[in-house]
Amino acid sequence: MANSAQARKRARQAAKANSHNSALRSKFRTAIKAVRKAIDAGDQAKAAELFKAATKTIDTIADKKIVHKNKAARHKSRLSAAVKGLQAQAAQ
């Protein structure tokens, strides 16, 4: 329990930041799932469009240090490879 005014304020700020960061983390996961769903459906155009939007979301949360930059890079790399694989599969 926070006893001083400073500690109470820090507790309020931490709760607010936690709520905001949780929302951004959820947006990150949702963006990845949307791209994966489009890839699984075989929709090349939609997958490329959603990948572009997901990349912005992933970069944003990495810049804000909500997820580590390496984790963000790993997700972007794997999604990019999956989208390119879908395009290569469609070309054959």
Swiss-Prot record:
One of its GO terms (biological process) is translation. Pfam families: Ribosomal_S20p. One of its GO terms (molecular function) is small ribosomal subunit rRNA binding. Residues 1-25 are annotated as: Disordered. InterPro entries: Ribosomal_bS20, Ribosomal_bS20_sf. Coiled coil: none annotated. It comes from the Bacteria. Keywords: Ribonucleoprotein, Ribosomal protein, RNA-binding, rRNA-binding. NCBIfam families: S20. Belongs to the bacterial ribosomal protein bS20 family. The gene is rpsT. One of its GO terms (cellular component) is cytosol. This is Small ribosomal subunit protein bS20. Binds directly to 16S ribosomal RNA.
